[in-house]
Amino acid sequence: MPRREDIKRILVIGSGPITIGQAAEFDYSGTQALKALKSAGYEVIIVNSNSATIMTDPEFSDAVYIEPLTVEFLEEIIKKERPDALLPTLGGQTALNLAVELAESGILDRYGVQLIGAKLESIKKAEDRELFKKTMEEAGLEVLRSRLVNNLTDALETAREFGYPVIIRPSFTLGGTGGGVAFNEEELREIVTKGLIESPVHTVLIEESVIGWKEYELEVVRDGAGNFIVVCSIENLDPMGIHTGDSITVAPSQTLTDVEYQRMRDAAYKVIDAIGIETGGSNIQFAVDPKTGRMVVIEMNPRVSRSSALASKATGYPIAKIAALLAVGFTLDEIPNYITGKTLAAFEPSIDYVVVKIPRFQLEKFPGADPRLNTQMKSVGEVMAIGRTFKEALGKALRSLELDAAPKLDLDHIREHLANPTPERISYIFAAFRNGMDVEEVHELTKIDRWFLREMKACIDLEEELKEKKFDVEVLRKAKQWGYSDREIAEIWQVSEKDVRKMREKNRIFPVYKMVDTCAAEFEAQTPYYYSTYNGVENEAIPTDKEKIMILGSGPNRIGQGIEFDYTNVHGVWAFQEEGYEAIMVNSNPETVSTDYDTSDRLYFEPLTVEDVLEIVRNEKPKGVVVAFGGQTPLRIARHLVEEGVNIIGTSFESIEIAEDREKFAKLLKRIGLRCPPFGTASSVEEALKVAEDLGYPVLVRPSYVLGGRAMAIVDTPEELERYVREAAIVSPGYPILIDKFLEDAIELDVDVVSDGKYVWIAGLMEQIEEAGVHSGDSACVLPPVSLSEKLVEEIEKTVHRLVKALKIVGIANIQMAVKDEEIYIIEANPRASRTVPFVSKAIGIPVAKIAAKIMVGRSLPELLSEYFPYPTRPGTKVDKLGDSEILPTPWPRMFSVKEVVIPFHKFPGTDVLLGPEMRSTGEVMGIGEDFAEAFAKAEIAAGNPLPTEGAILATIADKDKRDAIPLLAHLADMGFEIYATKGTAKALQSHGVDVKVVPKVGEGRPDVIDLLEQGKISLVVITQSSDEPSLVAVSHGKDPFKVEGRRTVGYMIRTTALKRKIPYLTTVEALRAAVAAIRKMKRGSIVKVRKLTDTWKM
């Protein structure tokens, strides 16, 4: 079946902001699909609210819309662009849910748009738990006993009938949100109540428990002619009961017999057939009872998913690209296998290596959250590693996680930790074996298959052998084949990593590189995609004689280092290719565009450690290595690379050192006459109190050695400082604590700047909406800035110029500053690309990272910018040609862009939602408008926090904020909002003549503030933190060894109730000010205006 000629224009919906359960894998899938559809001759329109994506770059489609992903905005885009078809299978759960809404509300029919890639009926059969169960039973497939309920009474009755434990799964939610496992009635009440709120249709499925069964997934593809292939089988090392996104997974599956696999394969075909998936990729999950072999179908996703991204990277088979072509009528035997170039996509991939994926967690960012893993996903990223054996792949994957220190284990409670898995579970399994437990005991507690446990125990036995035979060459060779790093061997031998490397080199123990080719080396691959192994002789990565640039990626997604850095990496790759170099990418993250087989010239899927990078350098001998695009990951290993003679291009390592070292940086600022907030260091509690007294409170404290992840805090009093130092940090001469004067009421600015060593260009000058003290990664920001005077902007440009020249920046840097009383303070400078680069590039219409990369290989800045000149500059400034001054003109777009963040608080009930100096957001959205108010309102809608235009507001304002907040609340009252307030706030409002209803605080009478929220009477909560509300850990609740730290102040209860009830909330005066402007704009008329991204640059 050739391509469909009845379709010309296709609308693709992206997945929106990165959240837990829906991450960078959808940018990877989307980008692949857009490329495929364009090359097949279709016009493509893409809509996504996330600017930090390659798929929203204008090169990949005919029209890009960065707009909120809601039905109202999508209808406007459909009305304007008139697509023939909508492809909803590339944007995760978000896009599927929207497709269902657009179809059911009649919008698709009204504009004559047809769904391709998945029919409405199929989406519903796969997503609606009750329908899915019925469909499976009709197809003769076994599913778990379950019942759909919409109230607590029915849930309790069902659980009694099935017997505890039971699994609770809310309908139509992402990453298991709101679900869980209930072992008793009390837990059931809690989970069901939450699940009914989280489910958009307010139903949950109560399901019999299969905890401890083995979990498998098949990634399958089917075309319109009925051809069906299994791309990859994936085995979860962790048994059922842990979300597959939080499980360690292995491909291909290791413990299935051939008979079981064939049975599963046949069942998968029946599933796809029964659901009615005619074309595209699907992911099907099975559970197998290890005792009886009983197999049940758990669920299926009728779209590309996290697992399909993993399967694509594991096999080299590009599922998303092929699914997109199948959706427009191609069949598998008409599509080439892009890796071999010789075979067809109808061939099932076969692989001669093992792939291990391990999730990356950051629970320390969410104190108060339960650390135990369950059916609700909690990890923020993942790594993948490839080896010839399971042991080798596991070893490589563990070091790819980039966990700086071994986790602190609670050795008195090993058995509890084995029975209740937490993110440290692998460390506990190793600890159990080191402490003499046997495979059988560990299996009983963990229910992990004995085969995996025997492999892990063998590694611990090898540790003993290493200790006994120190410096034995054969044992060293064996350890390398089993995936041990030089660093781990060095720790066992108590020598330096360098010593082990020297011994290895002397005995010629080197890895060889093997190719990922989809066909177990049966055909020759065209696309160079490699992994290292010590279990091989022949090196398949033969270097070319071209000049090469090697780019170090950013490793697993984590908070503070996410998809934005991958965006920069990819732009870097393209820039070096355009300049005639061979671009080599090194990364370990399977979710990303940078690890796509056709992004770079050569891809090494390897851990980002000194050892692994040096081995690739030894093989490829690049002209230079780029460390400025991957966030902190490459910077952390830069020193070791330089010591080994690796050439780092761009900003020199000396400059990186100065910027990263507080004392050196402060000296440099002093030398060039710039200010930074006064600071001091302390090595004891007494010194800390003295430094703070000299600086004057409030102060910002950060220890150089962190315990329990509470890295930074703003402290207002000596008592708080003393408590902080005793509880949250180790303070000793070896581990000093840094204390900065905290600038209250300052405006914080974020500057992305590019320089070629002579000219300096501020690409983006952003103003943070939250006050200084909220981490810039968690604050919304606006470009161009809204509250800076003409004089101040000129002053900022000169300051940046002076600092960039002094740091000798070549390429890109990010500078954070604060402005207080018209004085400029430098907070920090990062000699690398920052997380705002994609946002700035989309706001100004100039690819900032590409320009920075070309500068690193010798191009000049005015020459590169001339292609985009003239671009809009500040009103009143006139620039005829670039290069008259060393300070190149700062872009000043006529449209306003707001970046807003998305923080996964609802995944971690128990965590306080206050913003502070510790970053916790996982993703971002962008709102574009003709003024700040419109842009902010759209950004809030896109972030899932839409502001109300009517209803009641609950206000409880700290004394220090009343002066600024009361007039703003009065303004909302004038706009017709009803105001409820606690006693002190109400009094202040009444003195301003505002009509207000007084509500008792908790414990001061009923109905109190919490009752009001629970009754659903409030449409917006405004609550700022008061200084008498302790901002430190106080009470602890929960059973050993899973103590949960948390605070239970009234403010905390109000914030968490608002979060739980999905009521929008504002926690700072700045956010309130922005919200008032946005609400006023929304009340004046619709803000549902959509604009093509490229048009916003021409305004």
From Swiss-Prot:
<feature type="binding site">
    <location>
        <position position="299"/>
    </location>
    <ligand>
        <name>ATP 1</name>
    </ligand>
</feature>
<feature type="binding site">
    <location>
        <position position="828"/>
    </location>
    <ligand>
        <name>Mn(2+) 4</name>
    </ligand>
</feature>
<feature type="binding site">
    <location>
        <position position="299"/>
    </location>
    <ligand>
        <name>Mg(2+) 1</name>
    </ligand>
</feature>
<feature type="binding site">
    <location>
        <position position="242"/>
    </location>
    <ligand>
        <name>ATP 1</name>
    </ligand>
</feature>
<feature type="binding site">
    <location>
        <position position="748"/>
    </location>
    <ligand>
        <name>ATP 2</name>
    </ligand>
</feature>
<feature type="binding site">
    <location>
        <position position="776"/>
    </location>
    <ligand>
        <name>ATP 2</name>
    </ligand>
</feature>
<comment type="subunit">
    <text>Composed of two chains; the small (or glutamine) chain promotes the hydrolysis of glutamine to ammonia, which is used by the large (or ammonia) chain to synthesize carbamoyl phosphate. Tetramer of heterodimers (alpha,beta)4.</text>
</comment>
<feature type="binding site">
    <location>
        <position position="215"/>
    </location>
    <ligand>
        <name>ATP 1</name>
    </ligand>
</feature>
<keyword id="KW-0479">Metal-binding</keyword>
<comment type="function">
    <text>Large subunit of the glutamine-dependent carbamoyl phosphate synthetase (CPSase). CPSase catalyzes the formation of carbamoyl phosphate from the ammonia moiety of glutamine, carbonate, and phosphate donated by ATP, constituting the first step of 2 biosynthetic pathways, one leading to arginine and/or urea and the other to pyrimidine nucleotides.</text>
</comment>
<feature type="region of interest" description="Oligomerization domain">
    <location>
        <begin position="403"/>
        <end position="541"/>
    </location>
</feature>
<feature type="region of interest" description="Allosteric domain">
    <location>
        <begin position="945"/>
        <end position="1099"/>
    </location>
</feature>
<feature type="domain" description="MGS-like">
    <location>
        <begin position="945"/>
        <end position="1099"/>
    </location>
</feature>
<feature type="binding site">
    <location>
        <position position="210"/>
    </location>
    <ligand>
        <name>ATP 1</name>
    </ligand>
</feature>
<feature type="domain" description="ATP-grasp 1">
    <location>
        <begin position="133"/>
        <end position="328"/>
    </location>
</feature>
<dbReference type="GO" id="GO:0004087">
    <property type="term" value="F:carbamoyl-phosphate synthase (ammonia) activity"/>
</dbReference>
<dbReference type="InterPro" id="IPR016185">
    <property type="entry name" value="PreATP-grasp_dom_sf"/>
</dbReference>
<feature type="binding site">
    <location>
        <position position="828"/>
    </location>
    <ligand>
        <name>Mn(2+) 3</name>
    </ligand>
</feature>
<feature type="region of interest" description="Carboxyphosphate synthetic domain">
    <location>
        <begin position="1"/>
        <end position="402"/>
    </location>
</feature>
<dbReference type="GO" id="GO:0046872">
    <property type="term" value="F:metal ion binding"/>
</dbReference>
<dbReference type="InterPro" id="IPR011761">
    <property type="entry name" value="ATP-grasp"/>
</dbReference>
<comment type="similarity">
    <text>Belongs to the CarB family.</text>
</comment>
<dbReference type="Pfam" id="PF02142">
    <property type="entry name" value="MGS"/>
</dbReference>
<feature type="binding site">
    <location>
        <position position="828"/>
    </location>
    <ligand>
        <name>Mg(2+) 4</name>
    </ligand>
</feature>
<dbReference type="InterPro" id="IPR005483">
    <property type="entry name" value="CbamoylP_synth_lsu_CPSase_dom"/>
</dbReference>
<feature type="binding site">
    <location>
        <position position="299"/>
    </location>
    <ligand>
        <name>Mg(2+) 2</name>
    </ligand>
</feature>
<dbReference type="GO" id="GO:0004088">
    <property type="term" value="F:carbamoyl-phosphate synthase (glutamine-hydrolyzing) activity"/>
</dbReference>
<feature type="region of interest" description="Carbamoyl phosphate synthetic domain">
    <location>
        <begin position="542"/>
        <end position="944"/>
    </location>
</feature>
<dbReference type="InterPro" id="IPR013815">
    <property type="entry name" value="ATP_grasp_subdomain_1"/>
</dbReference>
<feature type="binding site">
    <location>
        <position position="299"/>
    </location>
    <ligand>
        <name>Mn(2+) 2</name>
    </ligand>
</feature>
<feature type="binding site">
    <location>
        <position position="301"/>
    </location>
    <ligand>
        <name>Mg(2+) 2</name>
    </ligand>
</feature>
<feature type="binding site">
    <location>
        <position position="830"/>
    </location>
    <ligand>
        <name>Mn(2+) 4</name>
    </ligand>
</feature>
<feature type="binding site">
    <location>
        <position position="774"/>
    </location>
    <ligand>
        <name>ATP 2</name>
    </ligand>
</feature>
<dbReference type="GO" id="GO:0005737">
    <property type="term" value="C:cytoplasm"/>
</dbReference>
<feature type="binding site">
    <location>
        <position position="285"/>
    </location>
    <ligand>
        <name>Mg(2+) 1</name>
    </ligand>
</feature>
<dbReference type="Pfam" id="PF02787">
    <property type="entry name" value="CPSase_L_D3"/>
</dbReference>
<dbReference type="GO" id="GO:0006526">
    <property type="term" value="P:L-arginine biosynthetic process"/>
</dbReference>
<dbReference type="GO" id="GO:0044205">
    <property type="term" value="P:'de novo' UMP biosynthetic process"/>
</dbReference>
<feature type="binding site">
    <location>
        <position position="828"/>
    </location>
    <ligand>
        <name>Mg(2+) 3</name>
    </ligand>
</feature>
<feature type="binding site">
    <location>
        <position position="241"/>
    </location>
    <ligand>
        <name>ATP 1</name>
    </ligand>
</feature>
<comment type="pathway">
    <text>Pyrimidine metabolism; UMP biosynthesis via de novo pathway; (S)-dihydroorotate from bicarbonate: step 1/3.</text>
</comment>
<feature type="domain" description="ATP-grasp 2">
    <location>
        <begin position="666"/>
        <end position="857"/>
    </location>
</feature>
